Each structure stands twice: as structure tokens, then as C-alpha cells.
Amino acid sequence: MRSQFAWNAGFLGALLAFSAGGGATAATVMAFDEADNGAAAQPRTMILDTDRLRMSTAATDVVFRGDLNKVWVLRSKDHTYLELTPGSLGQIGARMDQAVGQMKEKLAVLPEAQRKQIEAMMAARMGQGAPAAPPQVAYEKAGDSRTVGDWSCAPFQIVVGGKASSEVCIAKLSELGLSRDELTGFASFGAFMAKMTAAMGALRSPMTSINFDSMTKAIGFDGFPVQTTTKFGDGGRQIVVTLKSIQRQAPPAGAFDIPAGYTKIDFASMGRLLAPE
């Protein structure tokens, strides 16, 4: 789940955001490459259309409908989908609490040395629980401007709650040919996901904390990340997401709808839905 949200919510970072398509209105279509630990880059696509958004990978699509205040996570392999709503946030938090409680029960019967080792690993990976308030997000300049693809960008370290979470290279919207209005769906999706991941405590993705107004104030210009590098834990794993192109075109018919024949699943099946191929 963390890996999925690193792209879907953080991009996550750090990856880190669509009316039903087919109309005459052109949507903003962004193509990205995502490289996991130096492996061959995999294509990712994001479609933005007013208050709607669709993010696609080879295995999973995430659709945000601002008009319905819902997110659908679609899995083409088995034609299933998970629906996230504001009302489902409490269910997520309850399941997370239940899972943590079960883990603590299992740890209690282990030898002390082994238990402490596992607890330390869990603390490093998950943190110590949900803070009372969202963590503070800061942008720290991380070197001179550089070129990523066709764009000049300024590198910043994103610091969440006093800890470095990811590095982004941010290009000016004017250079990208984008406007804030075109990013409305992305901003609304980020706000929705921030509420959802807050229910998960320390598993929240730092990229869902991005607020365009706050970011503009912090860095001094309206911008958008053209490259995001997110590191996970102390294991050295990192995911690099790079913007490759921006186009305007009509979205495919039904781009923001649940495809016919898909079956809704519950939260007990969420791990299977979000598991990588």
C-alpha cells in the first residue's frame, strides 16, 4: 500500500496529484516515468479535467471524482475496485488500529531481544502513531537549478515534521505551460488523500501534504514537480518519478467512471487490490 500511495498520494511523493470523458473539452494529460531502485522505468499517466483526475499504472488506476467526493481504485487484472469516501476514513483507521493491536499481541510472546528488534524496525517504518495535528511541511533549497527533460527546475528537499521525506525539482508553471486552474483536480485529490492518510497515522504519504498556496509561498513561485525522488526507510530503496510530457486532448470515454463489469470489494480485500504485480 505504501508503494502505491507514494505514487498515487505522495507523488508520491514523491511521487507527489478528471467529467466522464469523450466530450469536446480538452483535458490535461501528463506522462511520467517511474524508476524503482534503478530498475527500468515504468510509464505512468495522469489525466486532469476540472475537478476530476485519473492516475494510471500497468496494474492499477485511481480515479478521483470531486463532484462525488469519491476515489475509486481500479484493478484491471481481476476487474475489481475499491471505493473511498469521507465516511470510509473511520473504517480505515479502525482496521489499522486492529492490525497494530494484533501485531503487538504476536510480539508479546517473542523473546525480548527479538521483540525489541522487530519493534525498532516497525517504528522506523511506520513511526510512532498518528500525531494530534498534521505535520508541518517545509521546503529547503537543495542546490542550483538544473534541467530535467525540457524544463529548468529548482531542487528542494521536502521536510515533513522535521524529517526529510523526498526531493523535488520544481519548474515554474509558466515554463510548463500550465495554469493553477488546470491543477484543480490534482489539488482536490491531494486534499482528499491527506484526510484519508491521516487516518493511517504515520503511514500517511508526505506528498499528500502538498498545498499549492503553501508551496508557492515557501518557494517563491507557482510551480509543479517535474522530478520527485522518494526514499523509504533505511534500506536504501528509492523511487524516482520524472515528468516526460504534457498534452491537451479529450479524455477517453468513461475515463472517470467505473468500467462495466467491475466488482466492488471491501476494505478487507484492500491489501490484495493494492498489492504489486
What are these regions (language model features)?
Residues Q4, A14-L15, S166:
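Mature extracytoplasmic/luminal segments of secretory-pathway proteins
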Residues A9-A20:
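Bacterial N-terminal signal peptides
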